[in-house]
């Protein structure tokens, strides 16, 4: 490793050029700042006498050093992207990192709510529609994206079942609590089968952001200290089923879980 480094004026000029090119490519000012910071950290580590002396091997060694130092996956991803931009800026071609192994992403511990806690949150929802959405998401183990897409025709009220549309193997049928039947009948009202069960004010699809917003308000009003999100309802339903000794494979198929290891551990009570 060389003890001499490129001159400051030369480095500043290069970083300014790189900054301008990233802005032209549509990167936000925050992203540009972060990537330039990663480039400067690499140069301080590598100390090249000339930027064009930088090699793909040197970059890979630097990234491996970052991995070994225990940095998070997101930081490694940011550094990798910055190095790819740096290399392309210098040589006009893609950086080959085929031998570089990034650390695995750490899955956050699922936030599990008890049935009483779900009820507590639902009871503090501002409207009966919002309350029913919280209850149905929990009772049927729905993703938020699935919840907002439910149409009246997806309900089988006699059999207490809900058809969840999807592509090919992602199509499935789940179930819901009999205690929701009357509320669902009322919510469906005079809507035809092709209409959304929980439409927006304009009659279209309610956004997942809107669900997150009213869920957060209900959570705060409930007084619970868990950092739950709408997705916690699905995770909590899975935990409830496992505690009732439901076959994990059957549960995986019913809820379209990507892998059995995505299930929270039975009796999990962790809060973030």
PLM regions and their residue ranges:
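Conserved catalytic core of the tyrosine transesterase superfamily
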Residues: 1-272
């Amino acid at each position: 490793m060389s003890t001499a480094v490129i001159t400051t004026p030369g480095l500043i000029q290069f970083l300014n050029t790189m900054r301008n090119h990233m802005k032209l490519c549509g990167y936000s000012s925050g992203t540009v700042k972060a990537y330039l910071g990663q480039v400067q950290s690499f140069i301080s580590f590598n100390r090249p006498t000339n930027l064009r002396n930088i090699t793909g091997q040197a970059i890979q060694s630097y990234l491996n050093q970052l991995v070994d130092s225990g940095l998070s996956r997101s930081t490694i991803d940011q550094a990798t992207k910055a190095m790819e931009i740096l290399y392309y800026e210098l040589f006009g071609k893609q950086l080959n990192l085929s031998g570089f192994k990034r650390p695995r992403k750490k899955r956050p511990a699922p936030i599990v709510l008890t049935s009483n806690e779900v009820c507590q949150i639902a009871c503090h929802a501002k409207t009966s529609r919002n309350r029913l959405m919280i209850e149905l998401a929990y009772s049927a183990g729905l993703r938020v994206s699935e919840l907002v897409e439910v149409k009246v025709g997806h309900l089988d009220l006699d059999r207490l079942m809900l058809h969840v549309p999807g592509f090919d193997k992602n199509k499935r049928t789940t179930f819901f609590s009999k205690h929701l039947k009357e509320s669902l009948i009322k919510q469906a009202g005079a809507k035809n089968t092709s209409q959304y069960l929980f439409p927006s004010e304009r009659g279209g699809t309610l956004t997942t952001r809107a669900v997150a917003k009213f869920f957060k308000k209900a959570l705060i009003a409930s007084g619970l200290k868990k950092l739950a999100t709408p997705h916690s309802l699905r995770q909590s339903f899975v935990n409830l089923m496992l505690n009732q000794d439901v076959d994990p494979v059957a549960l995986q198929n019913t809820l379209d879980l990507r892998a059995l290891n995505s299930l929270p551990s039975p009796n999990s009570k962790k809060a973030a």
